[in-house]
UniProtKB/Swiss-Prot annotation:
Database matches in InterPro entries: CTLH_C
Compositionally skewed regions (Basic and acidic residues) per UniProt: 803-818
Taxonomic lineage of the native organism: Eukaryota, Metazoa, Ecdysozoa, Arthropoda, Hexapoda
Protein name: Accessory gland protein Acp36DE
Impact upon substituting Q844R: In strain: WSII16
Keywords, comma-separated and alphabetical: Behavior, Secreted, Signal
Biased composition (Low complexity): 193-220, 230-255, 271-324, 521-544, 732-757, 765-785, 821-845, 862-897
Subcellular location: Secreted
Position of the signal peptide: 1-23
């Protein structure tokens, strides 16, 4: 998980939630947003320290996000976030001289005490040490006040306030220049200082007068009661003089410090503006005069006090000690209040940080939900594209197959036309031969009048045979035009069956002819030799032409078959890619479901833990509720049912909050936090747990809607697949029925023509040895290819081999029979050879067709075995295609069933 790539990805996600979507690609806005992010991180790491009276916190105005109309018409408007920082306006009042002077005016520390104090037996050294300690405290307080004077009149250049947003540091270039506002503030400060000094002088004069009167009265009383003691008076006078000297020294030090500060300010004023030099000089002179007057007055007052205020020194010192204690208590209480306010501010900042973190987490969750939505939409689009691609590929394959079938049919028509043209020529030759035969018969009839009965029978038989031949030829001529339109719908196997039937009829006719013409063969030997020479010369030329044509056609058929195979391979590869894509989609969907399950379980665990923690906290708070000193109010209660102005949220509940001592005891909710009040023990704060629960429920509803949409799409896809499967099953049943009918017809034809094939093979082997060799090669290749298809093809191959062996044995027997019967069969040889030439030509054309059929549909034999193997191979290929389609459909159905089961389980979990 924590590799570099993962860390970068997580950082991008977190930054993307903080940056708005519009300005993500704009460089200007991106820089501004990054700077804002840096500032927020700095504030989190080093929070600012506010003063005693904190102003309202920073308010951030969210930018107005305009919707994107189109990518071509986007006009980017720069609307940065406006951050309203609080501006602290310092009070331009007189300097509070409570810490310097006290509540009832200035006070001075005298070294001597009353004789009544000495009567108690306190040594003078201890009193002097106590006075020194008090004077040290005063000096420290004055130093602190002198250092903090710039806070009172807003001179921000003298303080380094990094964490305070209200204090702005002035650059070094701008130090020499003083604004007119600062000049006015300096003048006001000088006036206020002079006024405060005059007030302090008047107060000190009044006190000195009162003390002098009181001392005079006491002295008069003492003189009346006791005679004066010269030594004690001289000692007290010396002590008072030393104390007055010390006081004058401290006052001179203070005056020197004030003068140094004023000199610095005057130097700044002189550097600021040359125009205001005269005015500032006059003001400085007036201030100097006022300072000198105040110093003189203070000296006079000190002298008068040293002369007059001796008897009240002890009381004043006691009052000073009490005042200092009170001041110390006040300062301690102020420091405590300041620490409390700082702690409250830190708590506020921490709560704000928690709120920001919760908002960022919610935004990140929303971003993740949007990413999951986009991924699901992409998956749906991919599925739609895949289905469209499947339909398009199927339609393209069907179109290509139809075009190739049309081209094959056209080639078959051309072959039939050429065969009819080639057959028309031997038919004319046959007619001429028949005429010659008739002439010979007439001559024989004239010679053999004695044997009229036998000759009449023979003539009748020959005439019947000739009539049958003519009828057969007429039938062939009549059947050829009828075959042309039907050839488009008939397969090459059916055409071969029809041709085999015709050849069987011819062979039967020839057998009858041979039986009846054994007697007439001796008479027709001469005509036979002549007709043989002519027919052989003509048949050789025709055979060569037909062989050339057949070779060309075979090459064309080979090319077309290669194209068909390539298309089939492409279709298989496309099906494989589609199945792979479906598997990937299924795996992605399963991963998404697992993630959703884990999220749901994690959220349930968190909710349970939160409930337990809330219960524990509520119990602890109820147990602590008896001590009201541990609790205080944060925020303000709404009056008369009105909600609090700053609170936001769907539900507001009162909660008990402990005293702010540690951040670990803070509640989970947040709200507006202000000063502690003593009117009650409850606060108003929105419960963020309820908000998170509401958001989780909303997200769960969205996820349920997504799953329902996916299920509806999958059900539609399943219905389409079922329709396709039903159509394929109907086509397969129709093809099986056609194949069954063809096999029945072929079996009948093979049983009827098994007797006639023996003599056909003699003529075929004598004239077409090359065709038989090619057929055997094609049969061997067909056996090799069909051996992979199953047990049915192996059985057909063994049967075909047995038939070939039987045919070879029959051929050897017929050759022996022909050698023995050649001497006695010369009479009717012309008719037999003419029919044999026709049969040989037909057999050659058949052999060439069968070779093409062997390469197209893997036929093994020249007889019905080839057609049967074709039908079986077609059925096996169809069954394999059906099985592949069924396997794909089964896999798709399995995927759909799994998806439905998982979706139902999710629904049950959510409902539970």
């Amino acid at each position: 998980m924590w590799t570099l790539t993962c860390q970068q990805f997580i950082a991008l996600i977190l930054l993307g939630t903080l940056v708005p979507s519009e300005s993500f690609l704009c460089k200007h806005c991106f820089r501004k947003n990054l700077e804002k992010v840096h500032e927020s991180f700095r504030d989190i790491l080093s929070p600012p320290i506010f003063g005693v009276n904190p102003q309202p916190l920073i308010e951030v105005q969210q930018p107005k996000v305009t919707p994107k109309p189109e990518s071509s018409q986007v006009i980017h408007v720069h609307q940065p976030q406006v951050i309203l920082k609080p501006i602290y306006y310092p009070k331009v009042d007189t300097i509070s001289t409570k810490n310097q002077i006290g509540i009832h005016g200035p006070y001075s520390q005298y070294p001597s005490l009353l004789p009544s104090a000495n009567l108690l037996g306190i040594p003078n050294q201890q009193l002097i040490n106590a006075q020194d300690v008090l004077s040290d405290k005063d000096q420290k307080q004055t130093q602190v006040q002198n250092n903090n004077l710039h806070i009172r009149f807003g001179v921000s250049a003298l303080r380094e306030g990094r964490n305070n947003p209200s204090l702005e540091t002035i650059s070094r270039d701008k130090v020499d220049k003083i604004s007119p506002a600062l000049q006015l503030q300096l003048l006001r400060y000088a006036d206020s200082q002079s006024q405060s000094q005059t007030q302090s002088q008047s107060a000190s004069q009044s006190e000195s007068n009162a003390s002098s009167q009181f001392q005079a009265q006491e002295q008069s009383n003492r003189l009346l009661e006791n005679p004066p003691v010269s030594e004690s008076q001289s000692q007290s006078e010396s002590q008072s003089q030393s104390e007055s000297q010390k006081q004058s020294q401290s006052q001179s030090q203070r005056q020197q410090q004030i003068q140094t500060q004023l000199q610095i300010l005057r130097q700044l004023q002189q550097k600021s503006n040359e125009q205001s030099a005269a005015q500032s000089a006059s003001q400085i002179q007036s201030q100097r005069q006022s300072d000198s007057q105040s110093n003189l007055q203070l000296q006079e007052q000190s002298q008068s006090q040293s002369e007059q205020g001796k008897p009240i020194q002890s009381q004043i010192q006691i009052l000073q000690g009490l005042q200092q204690k009170e001041l110390d208590d006040k300062s301690a209480s102020q420091s405590q209040s300041e620490s409390k306010t700082r702690q409250e501010q830190q708590k506020q900042l921490n709560l704000q940080q928690l709120e920001e973190l919760s908002s960022s987490l919610s935004q990140s969750r929303l971003g993740l939900g949007q990413q999951i939505q986009s991924q699901l939409q992409k998956n749906q689009l991919d599925k739609q594209f895949a289905s469209q691609f499947q339909s398009q590929s199927k339609s393209q394959l069907e179109q290509q197959m139809q075009l190739q079938l049309q081209s094959l049919r056209q080639l078959q028509q051309k072959q039939l036309d050429e065969q009819s043209a080639s057959q028309s020529q031997p038919q004319s030759q046959v007619a001429q031969q028949i005429q010659s035969h008739l002439q010979l018969l007439r001559l024989l009839q004239s010679r053999l009048k004695t044997q009229s009965a036998l000759k009449s029978d023979l003539e009748q038989q020959i005439l019947l045979q000739l009539k049958k031949l003519t009828e057969v030829q007429q039938k062939q001529l009549a059947e050829q035009p009828t075959l042309r339109p039907s050839s488009k719908s008939q397969s090459p196997g059916q055409l071969e069956q029809q041709i085999l039937l015709q050849l069987q009829n011819l062979l039967q006719f020839q057998q009858n002819q041979l039986k009846s013409d054994t007697q007439t063969q001796s008479q027709l030997q001469e005509s036979k030799s002549n007709s043989l020479s002519q027919s052989q010369s003509q048949s050789q030329e025709q055979l060569q032409l037909q062989r050339d044509q057949n070779l060309r056609q075979l090459e064309q058929i080979k090319l077309e078959m290669q194209n068909i195979r390539e298309l089939l391979q492409k279709g298989k590869s496309e099906l494989q890619t589609q199945s792979d894509s479906q598997r990937r989609i299924h795996e992605l969907y399963q991963n998404i479901l697992q993630l959703n399950k884990e999220k749901l379980s994690y959220q349930l665990k968190q909710l349970k833990l939160k409930e337990l923690e809330d219960q524990k906290k509520s119990q602890a708070e109820i147990s602590k509720g008896s001590n009201p000193s541990n609790l205080f109010i944060i925020g303000q209660l709404p009056s008369e049912g009105k909600p609090a102005p700053g609170n936001q949220g769907p539900s507001i509940e009162p909660k008990l909050v402990p005293q702010p001592g540690s951040l670990d005891k803070l509640p989970s909710g947040g709200g507006l936090i202000g000063k502690p009040a003593s009117t009650g023990l409850y606060i108003l704060s929105p419960d963020f747990n309820d908000l998170s629960d509401y958001r989780d429920q909303f997200r769960l509803q969205q996820e349920l809607k997504k799953h329902q949409n996916i299920l509806s799409l999958l059900q539609r896809r399943q219905n389409d697949i079922k329709k396709q499967q039903n159509a394929q099953l109907l086509l397969g049943q129709q093809q099986k029925e056609q194949q069954a009918q063809e096999s029945i017809n072929k079996q009948q034809s093979s049983s009827a023509g098994s007797s006639s094939q023996t003599k056909l093979q003699q003529d075929i082997q004598s004239t077409g040895a090359q065709g038989s060799q090619q057929g055997l090669q094609a049969g061997s290749t067909g056996l090799q290819t069909s051996s992979l298809q199953g047990t049915e093809s192996s059985a057909s191959q063994s049967a075909a081999l047995q038939r070939l062996k039987e045919q070879e044995q029959l051929r050897i027997q017929t050759e022996n029979d022909q050698k023995t019967s050649s001497s006695s069969s010369h009479s009717n040889s012309q008719n037999s050879q003419s029919s044999s030439s026709q049969s040989s030509q037909a057999s050659q054309s058949e052999a060439q067709r069968q070779e093409a059929g062997n390469r197209n549909t893997l036929l093994l034999d020249q007889s019905s075995s080839k057609t049967q193997s074709e039908s079986k191979s077609e059925s096996s290929s169809q069954s394999s295609s059906h099985s592949s389609s069924q396997s794909t459909s089964n896999s798709s159905s399995n995927v759909q069933s799994k998806l439905q089961g998982e979706s139902q389980a999710l629904l049950n979990n959510l409902s539970g």
